[in-house]
């Protein structure tokens, strides 16, 4: 009986630790326009996303591609870390060794003839800032 109890306890702890892991991906949205500045609606578009280290022209530490469908407003939504990996791994990015920049390239015709649409510095979200502060708090004395 004791072995069964121990086994169940270990199983619960293992499963709980798996679910406690933060996903190694993050959301991204963009509005897609063609060369004539018209919205690309309800269409498949090709997207290449690169995480650059150091500057807007830094080394690409992670690159992936997606083919996604825009909605009626030209909006595309994807999860970076869930595409077809071309280079690197999200899990291996040393986020403490930044800054990092997100470069997006889009082919509004759904292929791989990408044009750079944006390169922006990746900044903290309030959730991450809160987590950083929580890590500084010492143990409570009971």
Give the label of every model feature segment.
Residues 3-139:
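Family-positioned intrinsically disordered, low-complexity linker/tail segments enriched in G/S/T/P
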């Amino acid at each position: 009986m004791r072995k069964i109890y121990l086994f169940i306890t270990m199983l619960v702890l293992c499963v709980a630790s798996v679910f406690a892991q933060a996903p190694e991906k993050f959301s991204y949205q963009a509005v897609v326009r063609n060369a004539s500045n018209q919205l690309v609606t309800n269409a498949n578009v090709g997207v290449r996303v690169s995480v650059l280290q150091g500057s807007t022209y830094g080394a690409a530490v992670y690159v992936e591609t997606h083919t996604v469908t825009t909605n009626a407003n030209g909006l595309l939504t994807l999860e970076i870390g869930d595409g077809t990996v071309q280079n690197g791994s999200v899990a291996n990015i040393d986020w403490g060794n930044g800054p990092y920049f997100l470069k997006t390239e889009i082919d509004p015709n759904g292929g791989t003839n990408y044009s750079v649409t944006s390169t922006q510095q990746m900044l903290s979200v309030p959730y991450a800032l809160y987590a950083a502060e929580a890590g500084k708090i010492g143990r409570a004395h009971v």
